[in-house]
Amino acid sequence: IIEESKDSDIDPEFLLTMANIESTFNPNARNKYSGAAGLYQFIPSTARAYGLKNPYDPRQAIQAVIKFTKANAAILAKSGIQVNGANLYLAHQQGAGGAVALYRSAARGTPLDRTIRRNIDANGGRGLSAKQFIEMWKRNYLSKLIKTRSLVKDAGVQLEETPNE
């Protein structure tokens, strides 16, 4: 993950944290309900969209998640949403459009559409408002980031300091 991230402008710590959240670093992980597979749990349609032919191939999965993250970052930035690890992970999980809709709903206090509501409910947010779900997601991401930092340190891996996190 660290090696593949060197040629991109994506923070390796973010990529490590995402792999920890999505699959606990298991490249053979599979969600039997959604069909999501691999290190970053790409669903088949997203895998195809980002050229991921074999989601169980870690190198391919890392290259695809870098492309996906860059696309998500561009959409978040264009929408005026801060581009950081927690928001990029929210965009990975909800789709960039879903993340933007969540932020807009949180700002306006408006209800969410059925698809986003269903996604929130399926991801531990049953009964939460958009704002509450975003805050829960940020806390979850930061908790996993801290755990990932500990794992990396325990493995004796030194990461370069990265701004914007």
Whereabouts are the PLM-identified features?
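Catalytic glycan-binding domains that act on GlcNAc-containing polysaccharides
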Residues: 1-127
